[in-house]
């Protein structure tokens, strides 16, 4: 027979389903009679207590995080999901608050984290969907839709250029295609690139990764490989594309770095592949390219997790720390000067810099001060 358990109202006993007779072996008849006469303990109250106990047990199994960093990570996850569910007008209004530059030719916005540029499977809302609404908010109800000039990955934040008409969009797209636009990205890396500055010039190709889950990734397609200590030329894949990235370490510790990246070419996932597979320094929060064979949360060292204030089980929620920091466009139309566009870092990026003890260059002292304020919260 089950042992008695105690509730807020006294002892209750898990019987064997045989009726009141099973209780008489544990309690005296007077006590049993009194309990039967009492209306304080009834089936409804008992059921409520059982439900309350179950909720309490579930809470103990999955405690709510009180860690400030983990709360911020959870907020980013919730925010990213909300972006896919808000009304297009709400999203367009949010984008107007992040406008970096606006003139008769262009509108430059600060692209938020987790927002896709184009539609696709599973995408409920993207930037392309709200371009007509955004144009009307800026130029009135008769305004024609804005046009995309280039793209950024869903997880990448920062400078994004839109044009008021198709001709201007094509002009800017041609500048990107002919590599006349200077693009600078900032990334936080796991490990420190060696040497601290250089150029990665390794072609990239898309391949199928063989693992528990079959999936496709971009990867390196080098022209040479080492064979018994000798450098041997490799036959180039016909699908490989030339990919060149210039990089410089801006700040570093023993286990992480703030790196400025200047892609000379514009191949899909170029920066992520060159950092992870070329320099063995994956971007913090890159859960796709931190391991070739697996699609799994990024594995971080105990020291890095401790600095970030996270457990490994929460690493899956770390956002990709890749930010389109700056674009320099040549003079457009009747303009005589180049257009230098700089975008402030997102708050989660700034906070991670502070937690990892990474310093920003002196000219970015205001954002550095913001990092310290966030860390003190």
UniProtKB/Swiss-Prot annotation:
It comes from Homo sapiens (Human). It comes from the Eukaryota. Belongs to the pseudouridine synthase RluA family. InterPro entries: PsdUridine_synth_cat_dom_sf, PsdUridine_synth_RluA-like_CS, PsdUridine_synth_RsuA/RluA, RluA_PseudoU_synthase. Catalyzes uridine to pseudouridine isomerization (pseudouridylation) of different mitochondrial RNA substrates. Acts on position 1397 in 16S mitochondrial ribosomal RNA (16S mt-rRNA). This modification is required for the assembly of 16S mt-rRNA into a functional mitochondrial ribosome. As a component of a functional protein-RNA module, consisting of RCC1L, NGRN, RPUSD3, RPUSD4, TRUB2, FASTKD2 and 16S mt-rRNA, controls 16S mt-rRNA abundance and is required for intra-mitochondrial translation. Acts on position 39 in mitochondrial tRNA(Phe). This is Pseudouridylate synthase RPUSD4, mitochondrial. It is found in: Mitochondrion matrix; Nucleus; Cytoplasm. The lineage of its organism: Eukaryota, Metazoa, Chordata, Craniata, Vertebrata. GO terms for molecular function: mitochondrial ribosomal large subunit rRNA binding; pseudouridine synthase activity; RNA binding; tRNA binding; tRNA pseudouridine synthase activity. Residues 1-15 form a transit peptide. GO terms for cellular component: mitochondrial matrix; mitochondrion; nucleoplasm; ribonucleoprotein granule.
């Amino acid at each position: 027979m089950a042992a008695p358990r105690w509730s807020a109202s006294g002892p209750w006993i898990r019987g064997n389903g045989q009726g009141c007779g099973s209780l008489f072996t544990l309690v005296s008849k007077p006590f049993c009679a009194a309990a039967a006469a009492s209306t304080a303990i009834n089936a409804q109250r008992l059921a409520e207590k059982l439900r309350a106990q179950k909720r309490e047990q579930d809470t103990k199994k999955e405690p709510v995080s009180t860690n400030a960093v983990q709360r911020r990570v959870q907020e980013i996850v919730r925010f990213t999901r909300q972006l896919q569910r808000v009304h297009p007008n709400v999203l367009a209004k949010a984008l107007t608050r992040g406008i970096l530059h606006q003139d008769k030719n262009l509108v430059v916005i600060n692209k938020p984290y987790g927002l896709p540029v184009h539609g696709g499977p599973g995408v409920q809302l993207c930037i392309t969907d709200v371009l007509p609404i955004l144009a009307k908010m800026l130029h009135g109800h008769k305004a024609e839709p804005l046009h995309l000039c280039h793209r950024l990955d869903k997880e990448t934040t920062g400078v994004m250029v839109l044009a008021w008409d198709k001709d201007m969009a094509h002009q800017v797209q041609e500048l990107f295609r002919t590599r006349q636009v200077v693009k600078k990205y900032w990334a936080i890396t796991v490990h420190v690139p060696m040497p601290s500055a250089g150029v990665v010039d390794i072609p990239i190709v898309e391949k199928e990764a063989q693992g528990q889950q079959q999936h496709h990734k971009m990867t390196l397609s080098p022209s040479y490989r080492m064979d018994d200590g000798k450098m041997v030329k490799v036959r180039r894949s016909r699908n490989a594309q030339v990919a060149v990235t210039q990089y410089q370490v801006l700040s570093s510790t023993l286990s992480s770095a703030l790196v400025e990246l200047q892609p000379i070419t514009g191949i899909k996932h170029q920066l992520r592949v060159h950092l992870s597979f070329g320099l063995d320094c994956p971007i913090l929060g890159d859960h796709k390219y931190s391991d070739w064979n697996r699609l799994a949360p990024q594995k971080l060292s105990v020291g890095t997790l401790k600095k970030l204030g996270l457990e490994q089980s929460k690493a899956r929620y770390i956002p990709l720390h890749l930010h389109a920091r700056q674009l320099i466009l040549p003079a457009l139309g009747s303009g005589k000067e180049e257009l230098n566009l700089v975008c402030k870092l997102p708050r989660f990026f700034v906070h991670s810099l502070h937690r990892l003890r990474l310093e920003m260059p002196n000219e970015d002292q205001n954002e550095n001060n913001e990092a310290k304020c966030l860390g003190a919260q």
